[in-house]
Amino acid sequence: MKMILFNQNPMITKLLESVSKKLELPIENFNHYQELSARLKENQEWLLIADDECLEKLDQVDWLELKETISQNKNSVCMYKKGNEAQPFLEGFEVKIKKPFLPTEMLKVLQKKLGSNASELEPSQNLDPTQEVLETNWDELENLGDLEALVQEEPNNEEQLLPTLNDQEEKEEVKEEEKEEVKEEEKEEVKEEEKEEVKETPQEEKKPKDDETQEGETLKDKEVSKELEAPQELEIPKEETQEQDPIKEETQENKEEKQEKTQDSPSAQELEAMQELVKEIQENSNGQENKEKTQESAEIPQDKEIQEVVTEKTQAQELEVPKEKTQESAEALQETQAHELEKQEIAETPQDVEIPQSQDKEVQELEIPKEETQENTETPQDVETPQEKETQEDHYESIEDIPEPVMAKAMGEELPFLNEAVAKIPNNENDTETPKESVTETSKNENNTETPQEKEESDKTSSPLELRLNLQDLLKSLNQESLKSLLENKTLSIKITLEDKKPNA
């Protein structure tokens, strides 16, 4: 038999699990009718407990199917809440219990349904359990017989046991006494023996002195013989050591000779190589027809080859030491040469820097009058092109944006400091040369370097008016203090080339 629960409330499942434990029946819970119907059809031995909330959700077809299965088995219990007593979906269930209910109430209902004896299994029984226990105990006591006889037998047993215990104790005491007596007797015997030994010793002393003299002479003879034997024994090892000394000298000489031979002779690896060569030569010689002649002729070159190999290897060993020394000395020379070259390069670099500075100064002095002539030639061009001025002036939004040279030309004035400013423009790493300037700057900064081809291209595309404007903007952006800091320890070289105009231009 198994309890099958059709329920979706977890509290009810816990309550019925506790009831199933008391009934010692397994329980299975199903939330959906399809699973429940499949389980009910598998086995007919079950007790169905259904909840009205799940029964309300069933279709007409499912409810009719469930009603048929319940009617066949006749082991079904329905739980319902207040107000659902007369609902049609509760029809067919044999037992109905109202919610909420206690587990004991459900237990009683299930016990009645299962046909078990409620009086035996319920916790609140009519009979007192102590009465049942007493009845059973009296029945057992009647079978045991007279208690008085047992009570009389127990003291008799005790009296019988007591004398046996006393006898055992007495026996143990007697044994201990006997052991003590034996020990005392042994001690007395030992003492008597000691006394007898003490008495015997003076009697031995009273013996005649002749025995003592004889014993003394024998002792002396023994000592003399021992003394004689000792020097003989000492002489023997001395002779042995003397014999060993020349042997040691010979061994040392042999070792020295071996060392010399080993130094002169080739190493083990070399000997192996020589042996391999000898074997190869012997194999080659054995293959010939005349073995005896070839052996004699082969031995001579073999000896020669061995001697040559030995001499070559000894020479190689001797040469290895100076080679190592020469390698070390060569490495040291290379290092010193590298240091010297570095020093020379360091010393040459400032000279290279100083030479262009002096050349730049000379070129600068020559170029200043050229600039003046170029500027003089530029002024009539500016006068001849009043349209360009007007277009440029039209582009300026305010008077402040008009550069000073344009204003000066418009007013008919010349700027005398312009030539000086052109000569004193510093060379910075961030200054980018305009492609229309024919200026080559050589300074200590290595990043701004131009090839002569680039110079020629820049010369071809140069225009004097834009040159003046760029210089003027640069001078505006720099203050006097920044000019001073930039111009310190720096030189500027400007190269201007005059070329004939091409006929196409």
From Swiss-Prot:
Q: Which GO terms describe its cellular component?
A: cytoplasm
Q: State the coiled-coil residue ranges.
A: none
Enumerate composition-biased segments (Low complexity): 440-451
Renumbered to this chain, region (Disordered) spans 154-403, 420-465
How does inactivating the gene affect the organism? Deletion mutants cannot control the rotation of their flagella and swim with abnormally frequent reversals.
Keywords from the UniProt entry: Cytoplasm
Compartments (UniProt record): Cytoplasm
Instruction: Output the superkingdom of the source species.
Output: Bacteria
Q: List the disulfide bonds.
A: none
Q: What is its main location?
A: cytoplasm
Q: Where is the composition biased (Basic and acidic residues)?
A: 172-263, 289-311, 337-346, 359-373, 386-398
Assembly with partners or alone? Interacts with CheZ; the interaction is essential for each other polar localization.
Function of the molecule = Plays an essential role in chemotaxis. Regulates flagellar rotation through the formation of a complex with chemotaxis protein CheZ. Plays a major role in colonization of the stomach.
User: What NCBIfam families does the record tag this protein with?
Assistant: Chtaxis_ChePep
Q: What is the recorded name of this protein?
A: Chemotaxis regulatory protein ChePep
Q: Native species of this protein?
A: Helicobacter pylori (strain ATCC 700392 / 26695) (Campylobacter pylori)
